[in-house]
Design a protein with these regions (language model features):
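Conserved micro-motifs of the catalytic ATP-binding
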Residues: 99-104, 143-146
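Conserved glycine-rich
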Residues: 235-237
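Short alpha-helical segment of the dimerization/phosphotransfer core of two-component systems
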Residues: 79-84
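Short conserved segment of the HATPase_c
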Residues: 194-208
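Detector for a conserved hydrophobic position within an alpha-helical segment of the HATPase_c
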Residues: 231-232
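Short helix-loop "hinge" at the ATP-lid/N-box region of the Bergerat-fold HATPase_c
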Residues: 162-163
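Short beta-strand/loop element within the Bergerat-fold HATPase_c
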Residues: 169-181
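Conserved catalytic submotifs in the C-terminal HATPase_c
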Residues: 105-110, 127, 132-142
């Protein structure tokens, strides 16, 4: 009888432990989902509001045509429309990737050319924040088989991340070198860094480093998750080296064989 009681007690305790674990997991997933929805709402609302204000200015008959600065207004609408499109595409690409329907088209390309193109697209943004981007292209052989679109996107995400977490004026370094029959590409910043407890989760889908304000740093928490998946699709690897309040360095290795 005692043995049966012990077994029953053990079953009850295990059942309680499993139920509690499931409840905590569901609560965590619910919190992540709510954070994602809040961030997505904020990210989509901002460009929509800006476009709305710009169009109201165009329709406002009380403002003289000469004072409206039409070229500036049209540029704002164009920029915000592009921003809105990129945000929507980012969510859709993640959904397609998770469904397993995304196709990778490998081509032999010079990665230095792609990296240079992406870096140039950030020059104005970084200069407007009184920052700088340095390039150290040390790889003697920068040719590898990659998907041009996705490799461009993953580089864009890494640089975008470096700018977002710059904590003031961005100081970013992009470097390449040949390493173990591959090309090592590093994006390094002098930003806020990442705490040890967050580093293991940094590549999780929807995960965003807490900065005290949920809207302090824009984004859905999809960027680094996408980067990791795409590096793995290229049979490569990614590593994070970070020190809190001192900056982060992301290193990816793309094989060349």
């Amino acid at each position: 009888m005692t043995l049966i009681s012990v077994i029953l007690s053990f079953i009850v305790i295990m059942g309680f432990a499993i139920t509690t674990h499931i409840m905590f997991k569901q609560k965590k997933l619910s919190r992540i989902k709510n954070d994602f929805v809040n961030n997505m709402t904020h990210e989509l609302k901002t460009p929509i509001s800006t476009i709305s204000l710009a169009t109201q200015m165009l329709k406002d008959h009380s403002i003289p045509e000469s004072s409206k600065n039409l070229s500036n207004i049209s540029r704002i609408i164009d920029d915000e429309t592009t921003r809105l499109r990129l945000q929507v595409e980012k969510v859709l690409k993640t959904a397609v990737f998770n469904s397993g329907k995304m196709k990778i088209k490998f081509k032999t390309l010079d990665l230095h050319q792609i990296i240079d193109h992406v870096v140039k697209s950030f020059y104005i943004q970084v200069e407007n924040q009184n920052g700088k981007i340095e390039k150290e292209m040390k790889a003697e052989n920068a040719v590898a088989k990659v998907d041009e679109v996705h490799f461009t996107n993953l580089m864009f995400n890494l640089l975008d991340n470096a700018v977002k977490y710059s904590n003031g004026k961005p100081e970013i370094k992009v470097e390449t070198r040949n390493f173990n029959h591959g090309i090592l590409i590093a994006v390094e910043d002098q930003g806020i860094g990442i705490k040890k407890k967050d580093q293991k989760k940094i590549f999780d889908q929807f995960y965003r480093v807490h900065t005290g304000n949920v809207h302090n740093v824009k984004g859905f928490g999809l960027g680094l998750n996408y980067v990791k998946k795409m590096v793995e699709e290229h049979n490569g690897s990614i590593k994070l080296i970070s020190e809190y309040k001192k900056g982060s360095r992301f290193e990816i290795i793309i094989p060349q064989q």
